[in-house]
Amino acid sequence: MPADRYRSGMIPVMAESPPFAGIASFFKAPYVADPRASDADVAVVGIPYDEATTARPGARYGPRAMRDASTNWAYRDGTAPFYDGEAGASLLGGVRFVDAGDVDLPPTSPPERSHPLIAARIRRLLEHGLFPVILGGDHSITYPVLTAFGSRPLHLVQFDTHMDYLNDEGGMLYTHASPIVRSHESGVVQRVTQYGIRGLHTASDQIELARERGVTTFWCEQAKRAAVEELVAHIEPGEDVYITFDIDALDPGIAPGTGTPEPGGFTYYEAKALLRAVAARAHLIGMDMVEVNPLYDPMEITALHAVRLIFDTVGAALSER
């Protein structure tokens, strides 16, 4: 192996070893502690945090589970593309990944401690022009991630079972039930679109508040029946969009490993089509995948779906950009 790759601070683990061997970085991409040591396009960062969950804990293990699952596709050599025969398109051609490790959060750290650490880490990636892919962690991490983008106008596109527009949970303002309302009311994002909302956890006051503030909500059954083109028509072509994907947006039959599952939900193909449509229409500037909880999925299919959807989305947004 070229010695200069070691001197650069990169640990070369991409295609030199089979998926089941070596370091389980995301996609077996080089691990780069300092993004300035890389000429990558995409930086993957884990946020192993679930102190803000109000249901089943375990999402702190999500980043590790998704990294392990990502090695299923680690036969890719460097920036060579995959070919998605079903989509009739090459995927991830020319896109260079690095794994930037995890945000170092003290155990049980409250929001006033964890949020600045998260925002600072993501801000460093953005300063170096990297496209951030964030592995959660519970959904509360989305708010501090978004604050790292500063004052640029953002359209937040959310895939979720729940609206996450709850003002507080027993007086707590920064749980996994409130990242969207916090991001919206603070002006961190200017527009919000929600896909896949369903179930019995979203109260009428959340719905009314979101509606009053101009949130565009597509209920799950509505989104499943509509044409994809109709679902993305309101997104301005080329506008800056950040995608947050709560894995409970998927049917728990294919994604059981999550903290607050609900019957129903998107299939993989439905989610893929909609994600790719959003990424192709907008200017995607980052994404997160949250609420993957491997403690409730011994078959590891939840993490597998999560990672494949990341590949699909990044591929649609960045391939040969």
What are these regions (language model features)?
Residues 2-321:
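Conserved alpha-helical scaffold segments that buttress catalytic/binding sites
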